A protein has these predicted regions:
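Feature for long, exposed domains in two main contexts
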Residues: 1-417, 421-462, 467-473, 479-483, ...
């Protein structure tokens, strides 16, 4: 029939009080059906708007502190904005004692110690449980007010005992980063300690800040580009604080990396922004070649490397292999000349090179002349091998009129003359099934990057498309069917 029932489930725990709006989308090959959904709750178990506001407030507090530590804002601006935000959050959630203590810290740092002391005295009088991380935070604030070494050592010992009782408290660990003598005298030890927490699953922005702060102050602490280092560097990249010195250290470590990493690539993009030097570009190109990054998105790096005349093994090959096969333009002259004498390219990449040379033959006739014999031999070899694609079709049409077609080659060319290309922009389409009136069984061809090739000896055929789920479509999916060659030009010679 014309009706389809689609059941769906709404998670009440993720709803706020009142009306909650959403959408259901049914994605078809050529259209998307969208239905508006409204669900209402009384708010008994829903996430309240107040809770969301507090969550946003905590995130804002963290970002303010990060901006202050990274010198994006001055002390007074950080303290005043934090106090204002904390006053608002205390009014919303008065039972949370941490807000008052955080306010006290902002006041202490801003040299308002008397106001901070009043807040801390109120907390101390009302605190009934002195074995919690919050009490440890209070003790830490005491060390900020009274800096006498023996007093600080005494409170540090108390915090250490609390940490033994609360070993999973990231708050207490963060506090000890500033109080433990072993961390004070050894930045590498401190850096490694934070690594254990972050690699253990802790995602506290305060720990990421402290880790980055260490390598910011001493880039040589960055001795490798492992998962921990990449997490911290990505955090720094998103904060917009990657420095030239860190970019240089990343460059020094890059030759040791042998595995392809999307995160590292994004960091390298940011590193080049702060250090757009030839050495950095060379290191990036070498890394991309070493990890076989030949997709079109990386082509700009190889192109830039050639423009800056970087001497790097495999750079010219990488340039061609990453060239967008759908675009035909001028290939740099040095690449054209290089591959005239030395070529380890696959036949598909050679075809890209030759098509670009053919396209530029009026502007660079001398290059075309030097390559003509090579292209003729290449065309003959590929016809004999039965290869055909868009670029090869251009080369065949260019070279065949030059007298290379003999009886033996004509026999190999005959089936290629009737090749069609079918293109479909819908990435859900996986196969095309071609039914010919003259044939009992259909052809079945697979799409690669939205393109497939099939043989059509007569105009009497029909095309059915099949998606990744096995669904078939006759006319509801848009596609383009185009002959690659002109068989009428050569069919008499092939018969």
């Amino acid at each position: 029939g014309s009706t389809l029932e689609v059941p769906y489930y709404v998670k009440k725990a993720a709803m706020h009080a009142g009306k909650n709006f959403g959408r259901l989308s049914i994605v078809l090959p050529e259209q998307t059906l969208t239905f508006e959904v409204c669900a209402t709750t009384d708010g008994a178990k829903a996430v309240s708007e107040e809770h969301l506001e507090l969550q946003c407030g905590r995130m804002r507090l963290a970002q303010l502190y990060i901006d202050y530590r990274l010198k994006k804002i001055v002390t007074g601006a950080w303290a005043n904005q934090s106090v204002e935000l904390l006053d608002h959050m205390m009014a919303m959630e008065p039972e949370c004692e941490m807000y008052a203590l955080m306010k006290a810290q902002a006041l202490i740092v801003n040299r308002q110690k008397q106001e901070a002391s009043w807040i801390m005295e109120d907390y101390k009088r009302g605190c009934r449980d002195r074995e919690t991380p919050e009490w440890g935070y209070y003790l830490y604030l005491c060390t900020l007010i009274e800096r006498e070494p023996s007093y600080v050592d005494k409170l540090t010992d108390e915090i250490e005992l609390l940490f033994k009782k609360n070993p999973k408290s990231s708050l207490l660990f963060w506090i000890l980063l500033f109080l433990r003598e072993s961390y004070y005298y050894s930045s590498p030890r401190k850096y490694k300690a934070i690594e254990a927490w972050i690699e253990g699953g802790c995602s506290s922005p305060y720990l990421y800040l402290e880790s980055y702060y260490l390598i910011w102050q001493d880039p040589y602490l960055l001795t490798r580009l492992g998962t921990y280092e990449l997490k911290v560097l990505r955090w720094a990249m998103r904060q917009g604080v990657l420095t030239k010195e860190l970019a240089q250290q990343i460059r020094h470590l890059l030759p040791e990396v042998r595995e392809k990493s999307r995160v590292l690539y994004e960091i390298l993009e940011a590193a080049y922004q702060v250090e757009p030097e030839e050495e950095m570009l060379s290191a990036i190109c070498a890394y991309l070649i070493r990890t076989q990054c030949y997709e079109t998105e990386y082509h700009r790096w190889y192109e830039l490397g050639i423009e800056q005349k970087i001497r790097l093994t495999g750079l010219y090959e990488a340039y061609l292999m990453s060239l967008d096969a759908r675009e035909v333009g001028g290939v740099p002259r040095m690449i054209q000349m290089y591959f005239q004498y030395d070529s380890t390219l696959s036949y598909t990449q050679k075809a890209v090179l030759f098509v670009n040379i053919i396209a530029a033959r009026t502007k660079q006739p001398e290059v075309y002349q030097k390559y003509q014999r090579t292209m003729e031999q290449f065309a003959m070899a590929q016809i004999e091998a039965g290869h055909i694609n868009d670029h090869l079709a251009v080369i065949y049409d260019e070279m065949l009129p030059k007298g290379i077609l003999d009886e033996e080659l004509a026999h190999s060319l005959a089936p290629l003359l009737f090749t069609h290309r079918i293109s479909c922009t819908n990435r859900q389409i996986a196969r095309a099934i071609i039914w010919h009136e003259e044939m009992k069984m259909p052809q079945s061809v697979s799409f690669v990057n939205g393109t497939a090739y099939f043989k059509a000896y007569t105009p009497q055929y029909s095309i059915v498309l099949e998606d990744t789920n096995g669904n078939r479509f006759c006319s509801s999916v848009v596609y383009q069917d185009e002959a690659l060659m002109y068989p009428e030009r050569y069919v008499d010679q092939c018969l």
